[in-house]
Amino acid sequence: AQQLFCTMTKERDGLHFDFSGTSPQTDTDHNSTLPSTTAHIALALTNTLFWDVPWSDGKMRPVKTDIPEGSILNCRYPAACGTSPRIGNVLVSTVCECVSKMIYASGRHDDVNACTNGNAEFVGGPGYFYGGHNRDGIPVAQGLYDIHGAGMGAAPYRDGVNTGGHMNIPSAGISDVERI
């Protein structure tokens, strides 16, 4: 099994994420490229700390990272990385947990956000998949993405939103049942 290690340090207005000790890249497709890893870190920070900062390259200026080359988070070419989004899901949960613990430890309990969709990232990703056979006996599969309507942002002293979308897809959502 691959392991993802993350040490987060806050110094003044900056954050530093060190992923030393993370598993080396694999011969399977359980690898992520550096751009994908960086994007998933940005998503986690957008939904926990930087929610009110405009989307721009400046958003990540106060963030420094050490991501070992040749690890599952920074694989070397020509490593397969078809499961990069799955690695990213786990990374988002990891970064969110680090940030939430930092805010909680600072005593700013009102500012602690729960990560979105509970722990869905660890149980299969942003949807549910099921299958069976159609009336002609042909195997079929189906994906259900109702999780895009999951809540987010609850804190110890306040409710979150009821349908915030999926954390890894900030603009996603589901149809309003009253309008269908």
Locate predicted features.
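Glycine/proline-enriched, intrinsically flexible loops and inter-domain linkers
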Residues: 1-180
